Amino acid sequence: MLIVSYCVVMTPVILSVDDEQDVTDLVRFHFGKAGYEVLTAASGREAIETIRCRRPDLVLLDLMLPDIDGFGVCEILRRTANTAAIPIVILSAWSTTDARHVGLELGALDYVTKPFRPEDLVVRVNRLLQWCPAPA
């Protein structure tokens, strides 16, 4: 009798939501090197549509977007049953305590200010994904 077991390794998927191409390129490069699949969206509406089509394991979310701002996207994701558990990390140039407080109150798990060290962000995301169960 031959017993074969399979181990399926899932590639973690993150969605980078930012209207600055340089930021999405930086995220794609560093997270790609770390073994992630990186989806991108340049607006709040595009982010919501992308998530409807393909649920990421985590969202990196800028606040200053051309249509729905990051706070609005965060609020929409948290109010929707099938997206409420997706971990969100805000990645923004807004470094005020008020912006950080609002983002965390709306359900983001972390708040990282730009400029940021990509290597540090990868480590933070790795840790969050270890602690948070994968979305169903």
Regions found by a protein language model. Give the residues of each.
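Conserved acidic segment of CheY-like receiver
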Residues: 11-22, 27-31, 59
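Active-site residues of response regulator receiver
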Residues: 18, 62, 92
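The feature encodes the CheY-like receiver
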Residues: 24, 66, 96, 114-115
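Alpha4 helix (beta4-alpha4-beta5 surface) of REC/receiver domains from two-component response regulators
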Residues: 28, 72, 95-112, 123
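Acidic catalytic/metal-coordinating carboxylates
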Residues: 43-46, 69-72, 107
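Short amphipathic alpha-helix used as the core "switch/output" element in two-component signaling
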Residues: 49, 71-84
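C-terminal output helix
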Residues: 116-126
